[in-house]
């Protein structure tokens, strides 16, 4: 059960309705997370900066690599909503998220995302070296900031117990325990 209910368009302020309309115009729908965040528009806008960083990284990394990175962070954090969201994107693209075929850069980003979520104090040197070989300092900072916003999104959804969006039901991420127990 969610910690707080989602906002409802019908009872929302004009400012919140504008954000709803903008999300529907851009994405065709509004997610449960965004509806929950819209209890506070500045909080909503802060989390939406994830899209700003995505748009900066997309020409450099591509959509698939960003989805792999986001999936690694989110599944490592056991975030039901975000893990399921990126699982769906990968599956819709023809991938098996549990058996990804990746190029070297995608594998590096997957490792980075996993390390960020599981043990950020001990990211191996080879990950940093691989990033330095491939990207400028500016891009590396953007990648790590993107991971940070992904972690923040994972945390928000988990702490607030936001309900899984219906469109994700068929792509539900198994918990770490469910994955361990097969």
Where do the PLM segments sit?
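Hydrophobic alpha-helical segments
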Residues: 1-182
